[in-house]
C-alpha cells in the first residue's frame, strides 16, 4: 500500500500571531487523510503553545473561501489561519 495515499500535503498560510511564532509566512505540512481545519490548528498550537490564546477567535480559510473548523481537507489544499488583527 502506498504510504502517501494515507496522507495529504497542504500549505498553511500564516498571519499575525501565527507568523510571529513560526517566523515564516507559510508552512508545507503532511497530515493524515480526513484531517479537518481544526486538526491543523491543533497541530500548530501543539508546536507553539503560546498560540492557544488565539484558538477560539481564529477564522479559517481553505482555497480562498472562509470555512468552518470541521471542514475536511484534501491533498493540495491551502489553509489560511486568520487571527483577529488590530489596526494601526
Q: Would you name each region that the model predicts?
A:
Residues 1-87:
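Ubiquitin-like/PB1-type beta-grasp interaction modules and other compact soluble beta-rich domains
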Amino acid at each position: 500500500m502506498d504510504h502517501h495515499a494515507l496522507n495529504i500535503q497542504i500549505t498553511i498560510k500564516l498571519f499575525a500571531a501565527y507568523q510571529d511564532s513560526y517566523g515564516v509566512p507559510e508552512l508545507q505540512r503532511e497530515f493524515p487523510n480526513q484531517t479537518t481545519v481544526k486538526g491543523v490548528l491543533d497541530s500548530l498550537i501543539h508546536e507553539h503553545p503560546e498560540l492557544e490564546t488565539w484558538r477560539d477567535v481564529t477564522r479559517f480559510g481553505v482555497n480562498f473561501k472562509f470555512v468552518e473548523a470541521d471542514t475536511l481537507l484534501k491533498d493540495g489544499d491551502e489553509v489560511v489561519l486568520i487571527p483577529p488583527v488590530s489596526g494601526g
